[in-house]
Amino acid sequence: MTQWYPASPALWQGRDDSIEAPDARRLFQTVTRSETFSPENWQQKIALMGFACDEGVKRNAGRPGAAGAPDALRKALANMASHQGHERLVDLGNWVAPTPDLEGAQQALRDAVSRCLRAGMRTLVLGGGHETAFGHGAGVLDAFAQESVGIINLDAHLDLRQTDRATSGTPFRQLAQLCDAQSRAFHYACFGVSRAANTQALWREAQWRNVTVVEDLDCHDALAQMAQFIDKVDKIYLTIDLDVLPVWEMPAVSAPAALGVPLIQVLRLIEPVCRSGKLQAADLVEFNPRFDEDGAAARVAARLGWQIAHWWR
């Protein structure tokens, strides 16, 4: 059974510059850490949650280790400067999945996300493998059953695989099937896709599902496509698979990208999403601290989370 645990206070430590000025603060001084999972107490805040699970990566024959990412990313976030928007972050702990119950873990995350959103919070989830996306996305769909939900994925992979069980490569096919079951439209856009890393069968599935696909080669000029997608939906779920970044910026993932989309381009793509007023949920997935020897990759991932919280409107 998937268990919930509050985040350790030892994770939120950093340099104290408060002697300089009242606003010389860092995230470890402004993030609120909750000892209970009680989203009803935190309306209008951002629920920071960890999904400590990499069973989907293992099933997908990837490099395990992403289950340790949530706490590694908290440590990287802790010492970053606190600016506008960061005071809204409330750490609502980790959902820890026992191997091999991926399906139970996804259901627990789904229920937690739905509860947060219904309570008036927004969710920022630290994965975990990309199996995080099914639990997170399903929770968003549940919370906004009467509205159109757009799923924006920055990823080298389409993750529309067809297998006999859930993996880190199946979340968007699962979400498409959930939309089918609920008789609602499946709005999915994937930016940063590597044609070299996706079979013709996956491209055919994306075409059949009317997925908006922007290849890694074209992301430097994709703001218009992003704007069009934002305009056509009511609510947005943003998921960032860190393997969208080039291997020299993000080596610490299950499947590093030989080409990838540089961090600055990723930030420019997500800025209008964050500022749209439609973003309800976001996550960072596939970070693997086992392959981050000096902590540099954790800081790259943390900068994305920092920026999302800062821009979120």
UniProtKB/Swiss-Prot annotation:
Catalysed reactions, as listed in the record: N-formimidoyl-L-glutamate + H2O = formamide + L-glutamate
The protein's Enzyme Commission number: 3.5.3.8
InterPro entries: HutG, Ureohydrolase, Ureohydrolase_dom_sf
Named cofactor requirement(s): Mn(2+)
Enzyme class: hydrolase
Pathway: Amino-acid degradation; L-histidine degradation into L-glutamate; L-glutamate from N-formimidoyl-L-glutamate (hydrolase route): step 1/1
Chain positions recorded as Mn(2+) 2 binding sites: 155, 157, 241, 243
Pfam families: Arginase
Keywords carried by this UniProt record: Histidine metabolism, Hydrolase, Manganese, Metal-binding
Claim: Iron is one of the keywords in the record: no
Cofactor note (record): Binds 2 manganese ions per subunit.
Ranges annotated as spanning the membrane: none
Lineage top rank: taxon: Bacteria
Signal peptide segment: none
PROSITE patterns to which the protein is assigned, alphabetical: ARGINASE_2
A Gene Ontology BP annotation from the UniProt entry: putrescine biosynthetic process from arginine, via agmatine
Molecular functions (GO terms): agmatinase activity; formimidoylglutamase activity; manganese ion binding
Binding site for Mn(2+) 1: 130, 155, 159, 241
CDD domains documented for this protein: Formimidoylglutamase
Role noted for this protein: Catalyzes the conversion of N-formimidoyl-L-glutamate to L-glutamate and formamide.
Family membership: Belongs to the arginase family.
Protein name as catalogued: Formimidoylglutamase
Organism field: Salmonella typhimurium (strain LT2 / SGSC1412 / ATCC 700720)
